[in-house]
Amino acid sequence: MLSENTINIVKSTAPLLAETGPKLTAHFYQRMFEHNPELKDIFNMSNQRNGDQREALFNAICAYASNIDNLPALLGAVEKIAHKHSSFLITADQYQIVGGHLLATIDELFSPGQAVLDAWAEAYGVLANVFIQREEQIYQDNQSQTGGWRGLREFELVEKQYESAHICSFVFKPVDGGSVVSFKPGQYLGIYINDEQFENQEIRQYSLSSSVRPDCYRISVKREEGGRVSNYLHDHLDVGSKVKLAAPAGDFFLDAAPTAPVVLISAGVGLTPTLSMLESLTEHQAPVTWIHATENGQQHAFKQHVKQLVETHPHFNSLVWYNQPNSDDKIGDDFQFSGWVNLHEIETVLKQADVQVYFCGPVGFMQFIAKQLLEMGVPEQQFHYECFGPHKVV
């Protein structure tokens, strides 16, 4: 329990942190990687270069300082981060390293005096313990389940299939021949790549793109321009290749009552977690609406698969938007609408009582979707979203 004095001191530093901006976290990361270069094997260095990770950490630090007297407000963020940390196999001793560099950064940038440093040390220690305990619980839960494991497990690529011009599916089975731990539709898998072409180990999380299978996992990866790992997987990972995986994790997952209508909204490769959800809703007792946006038919992944699911399950419905249809794309067959997704055109679907909405895609797309949902009066607690990469609020 934090003392009132600590709470007051940390809260008083919030305006200074906000004024400093991401310069704070840029200094922190530069310092940490200089003194502990081994941590480059854990952090996504691409997110370091584009600034996304710095921005995410800065927002988290500011949120903690501002809400230190109202920690329940941070529980959602803690759960999201703890799951991501478990996929990176973060350990308790690494929290000590990070804490040391955070305090040194505050001291070097602001010279705030020992009282402020002591307050932040106490506050960081409390928060670190919350994460350590929650992450240990996640590790133990995974390990204790049938097919579960802790740490890394070696898998073999047994199937590789292109779903569109830029999205490829990869199916992995454990080398030891055992079963695999179950997951919640919408969760992701941690994949660890060690290759001589990379200076450091590369770790990525990719959404599981199928319903639960007892002996394998499927991810579907978009080839991103300049994406180090996505291009590596597309170009160098072939059937028979071995990779190491961390157990499934993630706080974005299907959690709808059996009688609640479900709407799944995605753009581009954002369909991977929602497809896992769709495949898991074949016995659902309420209507399920699949809404997908993509550029055109060439970019439309899993088109036939979703069409077959809809045809064989009367409670399923599919609505597709093509931003710029090709000449051979057929309206009414390949897609129903063109341009940007306009949810007001299908307002009755979103205004069903107790509807649960799950959406995923580029940040701009999700912000646009969230804005429309709020305009239509869908309560915030009834929509759920996932950001690929460092979390952003939509």
From Swiss-Prot:
Q: What SUPFAM superfamilies would the database entry show? A: Ferredoxin reductase-like, C-terminal NADP-linked domain, Globin-like, Riboflavin synthase domain-like
Q: Where is this site: Involved in heme-bound ligand stabilization and O-O bond activation?
A: 29
Q: Where does heme b bind?
A: 85
One GO process term, biological-process aspect: cellular response to nitrosative stress
- CDD domains for this protein: flavohem_like_fad_nad_binding, HmpEc-globin-like
Q: Which GO terms describe its molecular function?
A: FAD binding; heme binding; metal ion binding; nitric oxide dioxygenase NAD(P)H activity; oxygen binding; oxygen carrier activity
The record ties this protein, via Gene3D superfamilies, to:
Globins, Nucleotide-binding domain of ferredoxin-NADP reductase (FNR) module, Translation factors
| Active site per database record | 95 (charge relay system), 135 (charge relay system)
- Superkingdom as given in the UniProt entry: Bacteria
| Residue intervals of the Globin domain | 1-136
Q: Does the keyword Cytoplasm apply?
A: no
Q: Give the E.C. number(s).
A: 1.14.12.17
Spell out the residues of the site Influences the redox potential of the prosthetic heme and FAD groups: 84, 386
| FAD-binding FR-type domain sequence ranges | 150-255
Annotated cofactor note:
Binds 1 heme b (iron(II)-protoporphyrin IX) group per subunit. Binds 1 FAD per subunit.
Q: Where is this region: Reductase?
A: 147-394
Its EC top class is oxidoreductase
In which family does this protein belong, per the annotation? Answer: Belongs to the globin family. Two-domain flavohemoproteins subfamily. In the C-terminal section; belongs to the flavoprotein pyridine nucleotide cytochrome reductase family.
PANTHER family in the cross-refs: FLAVOHEMOPROTEIN (PTHR43396:SF3)
The text the record gives for the protein's domains is: Consists of two distinct domains; an N-terminal heme-containing oxygen-binding domain and a C-terminal reductase domain with binding sites for FAD and NAD(P)H.
User: What name does UniProt use for this protein?
Assistant: Flavohemoprotein
